[in-house]
């Protein structure tokens, strides 16, 4: 008990400092085109591709160089030749409610052969809204062949914690995140999809080797559970490792190595406290529950994540670039042998970073809200 009280006192002190640090976060530093930016290990140039956006949520760079950007209101915007075009593609059946709306966008690993684009969004149902995954093909300025593949159950009137990031492993499997919709108990309940990371075939079928596929008391789509609201997910195809960042409450954001069938603890264990300052749990570790590789106190509100690959940014290879909504920067997180080493702020005060993506060209794309824009990072030797 004494150790718990000491830990809580320490955490509260850090949150108090965070309140002071956040006081100047309305001071946004928009990038100056062509200016060389220095980081600890890599210099780069920032180019602004689009401004005046409202609530950009997801980014996908096509093989032909066009950049697709989702607006939470239900539209896909197109950037071509480094400029925002007038083209807007409306996605049907999007329910804009609270934090919900049109969210992530990604292409199939064999996009150049099959043309499939995958979308996540909140959809209206009889009992409220629910996280939904669909796929479609681009046909000019509209979508065609749209197929709804999955909807997280149960639907609810709650407007929070939809999760909604989508990644592929290159073997025909799709992973995507589902938040607990603001109800803590959902995360430990295997009878629903909320507070989970889920795994399906690329056409929506349930893989026969999913961890709970033969458990009648669990949803067969579940890959891992005990999550709060994961809004950054990447799959490292070199090491066959799934990684995710998720929002904690007040403090306790996490970077996790996500493994088959494992429990990531929320809300039984957490390094955060409730927004009103009261404890959520008096323990931070428990047998049978996974520890984060990195956790943040105070919260940075992680949203969007890329893992740097290729030869364009050699000094950042395998580093994670994590969007920080609350702290308005991109966090460069360095690991060694799966353990946290260090972190650096990039693009400090650029705005609420919602999405970070590495394109097939090896360059880094970042979307922000407040102000709403998309920028591109190119290396400088």
Model-derived segments and their meaning:
Residues 131-141, 190-203, 258-259:
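Beta-propeller blade signature
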Residues 14-16:
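C-terminal motif of bacterial Sec signal peptides marking the signal peptidase cleavage site
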Residues 18-20:
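Bacterial signal peptide processing site
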Residues 88-100, 146-162, 202-224, 266-297:
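Surface-exposed loop and turn segments in beta-propeller and other repeat-based domains
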Residues 22-183, 235, 241-248, 298-336, ...:
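Acidic, Gly/Ser/Thr-rich repeat motifs that build Ca2+-stabilized beta-propeller blades
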Residues 227, 339-360:
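Conserved blade-ending motifs and adjacent loop-strand segments that build the rim/top face
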Residues 4-12:
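Sec-dependent N-terminal signal peptides
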Residues 123, 176-194, 252-254, 258:
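Short, conserved, GDST-rich strand-edge loop motifs in beta-rich repeat architectures
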């Amino acid at each position: 008990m004494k150790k718990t009280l000491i830990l809580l006192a320490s955490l509260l002190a850090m949150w108090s400092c965070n309140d002071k640090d956040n006081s100047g976060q309305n001071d946004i530093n928009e990038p100056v085109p062509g200016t060389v930016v220095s980081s600890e290990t890599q210099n780069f140039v920032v180019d602004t591709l689009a401004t005046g956006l409202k609530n950009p949520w997801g980014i996908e760079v096509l093989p032909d160089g066009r950049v697709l950007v989702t607006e939470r209101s239900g539209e896909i915007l197109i950037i071509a030749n480094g400029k925002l075009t007038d083209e807007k593609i409306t996605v049907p059946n999007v329910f804009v409610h609270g934090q919900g709306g049109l969210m992530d966008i990604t292409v199939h690993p064999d996009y150049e052969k099959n043309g499939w684009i995958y979308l996540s969004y909140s959809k209206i149902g009889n009992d409220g809204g629910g996280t939904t995954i669909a796929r479609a093909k681009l046909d000019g300025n509209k979508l065609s062949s749209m197929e709804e593949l999955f909807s997280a159950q149960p639907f609810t009137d709650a407007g929070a914690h939809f999760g909604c990031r989508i990644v592929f492993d290159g073997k025909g499997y799709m992973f995507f995140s589902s938040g607990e919709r603001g109800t803590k108990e959902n995360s430990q309940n295997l009878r629903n999809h909320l507070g989970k990371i889920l795994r399906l075939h690329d056409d929506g079928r349930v893989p026969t080797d999913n961890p709970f596929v033969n458990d009648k008391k669990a949803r067969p789509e579940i890959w891992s559970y005990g999550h709060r609201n994961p809004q950054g997910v990447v799959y490292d195809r070199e090491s066959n490792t799934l990684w995710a960042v998720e929002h904690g409450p007040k403090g306790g954001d996490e970077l996790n190595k996500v493994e088959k069938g494992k429990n990531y603890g929320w809300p039984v264990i957490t390094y955060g406290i409730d927004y009103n300052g009261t404890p959520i749990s008096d323990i931070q570790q428990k047998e049978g529950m996974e520890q984060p590789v990195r956790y943040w106190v105070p919260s940075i509100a992680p949203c969007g994540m890329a893992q740097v690959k290729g030869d364009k940014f050699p000094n950042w290879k395998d580093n994670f670039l994590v969007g920080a909504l609350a702290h308005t920067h991109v966090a460069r997180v360095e690991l060694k042998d799966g353990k946290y080493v260090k972190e650096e702020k990039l693009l400090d005060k650029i705005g609420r970073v919602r999405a970070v993506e590495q394109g097939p060209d090896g360059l880094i794309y970042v979307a922000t809200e407040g102000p709403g824009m998309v920028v591109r990072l190119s290396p400088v030797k």
